[in-house]
Design a protein with these regions (language model features):
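Charged, often Cys/His-bearing segments associated with DNA-binding zinc-finger transcription factors
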Residues: 2-76, 367-394
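Basic, amphipathic alpha-helical segments enriched in Lys/Arg and hydrophobic/aromatic residues
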Residues: 286, 291-292, 311-394
Length: 394
């Protein structure tokens, strides 16, 4: 009689370290391996405490920016719909304003904003939707932004500037004026369509849907030998704090100096005005002098006539201060880029105004978090003669 040794049948293995999804039958006598993954009914609360310990940048903005004030300004300009006769009630204005700020802080589409609100805990906390069973969908976000329009976003920008003044960050030490190109999707037209558009006519074979998808306001321009298509954003920045104080928009083909007067801030405590080589003109110099401003505009060499050494040194001196205006543009680029995907100049103005507003909001929150004194005057470095005298007496 032949005896066959058989291994006794093993019961299902239900070790939570090895098989957190349920009991399984191991293949052989595998040792129990421990895992760093821990399952807890209170995992959300533990994760929330971890986030608070690490620091949530959105909560810094929520703590230091008065969104109720911003919402009040919007409600005064665009009152909420009356729902006493029925219909779904609208979302609170403070929630929608926070959503728009999130959209432009992260350069998100309306579809991505909806998804991120459903997926990200930090977005839900910032928009006061942590305990909400529903969030605004993409259509709600789009319609709300359209309802605000240029007037609503301009009011948001001005209300943010009012908060700057409330905290003492007034425009000081002069102002810097500059413009930047804001690219937009390139439009393609046939020769016949372009000829009609140049005459101010719309091709008859365009359907209403096709017309809505064609941006007829954006223009082309060339800069440093490279072609651009889109719009232009002109801003005025105060030298001391680098907040955007004035803003206006135009098309890419417009010259930088076209909107100089619109972004000139008469509320700055200093009368110094800085600008690059695209702004000098005899008429502008006379205008600034008549208004009591001190002109610091870099000179551009005429064709065939180089600048003198004195003019070159003056340009270098101005450039040290004028370079501060490039920081807001770089920060906007860091927030997701300046490319806009809207149709028409009105919507482009809304997008560019929101970019500038979000830049000021983010910078103000950082200033208040770090305790930056609005009236702090940095100590100047000692002169060479003072250094030599101190060394000789040592």
């Amino acid at each position: 009689e032949i005896m066959i040794d058989r291994e006794p049948l093993k019961t299902p293995h239900s070790c939570p370290h090895c098989h957190p999804t349920g009991p399984t039958i191991p293949l052989m006598n595998q040792p129990c391996t421990r895992s760093a993954v821990k399952f807890d009914l209170f995992a959300d609360q533990a994760r929330q405490r971890k986030i608070e310990a690490l620091g949530d940048p959105l909560q810094v903005i929520a703590k230091h920016i008065d969104f109720d004030h911003l919402a009040g300004v919007i409600d005064g300009l665009c009152p909420r719909a009356d729902t006493r006769k029925g219909g779904r009630p609208p979302y609170p204005t403070a929630v929608m304003v926070r959503i728009l700020v999130l959209k432009y802080l992260n350069d998100l589409s309306d579809e991505q904003v909806e998804y991120q609100l459903l997926d990200r805990m930090s977005f839900q906390r910032f928009c006061l939707l942590s305990d909400s069973a529903n969030v605004p969908d993409r259509n709600t976000i789009w319609h709300y932004q359209q309802r605000l329009g240029v007037d609503g976003t301009t009011a948001l920008f001005q209300a943010t500037d009012a908060q700057l003044l409330r905290h003492g960050y007034i425009a000081r030490r002069g102002q810097i004026i500059d413009a930047t190109l804001v690219p937009a999707p390139i439009q393609h037209f046939t020769k016949q369509e372009k000829a009609l558009l140049d005459e101010g006519q719309v091709p008859s074979d365009w359907s209403p849907a096709k017309r809505r998808q064609k941006d007829l306001d954006a223009t082309h321009t060339k800069k440093h030998g490279k072609s651009y298509h889109g719009y232009k954003l002109s801003i005025g920045v105060d030298v001391r704090h680098k907040f955007i104080r004035k803003i206006t928009t135009g098309t890419a083909s417009e010259h930088d100096s076209t909107h100089f007067d619109e972004v000139l801030d008469d509320g700055n405590t200093s009368r110094d005005v800085y600008a690059d080589k695209g702004y000098p003109s005899a008429a502008r110099s006379e205008m600034l002098k008549a208004l009591g401003y001190r002109e610091h505009i870099q000179r551009k060499a005429p064709r065939g006539k180089p600048l003198s050494e004195c003019q070159k040194k003056r340009n270098t001196r101005i450039a040290r201060t004028r370079a501060r205006v490039e920081h807001p543009f770089a920060q906007i680029q860091h927030m997701g880029g300046k490319l806009i995907r809207t149709i028409g100049q009105a919507r482009a103005t809304v997008a560019m105004t929101m970019m500038a507003t979000c830049y000021n909001i983010k910078r103000l929150a950082r200033f208040l978090k770090d305790g930056v004194d609005a009236f702090y005057k940095a100590a100047t470095s000692p002169s060479k003669s003072e250094t030599r005298l101190k060394t000789a007496n040592a």
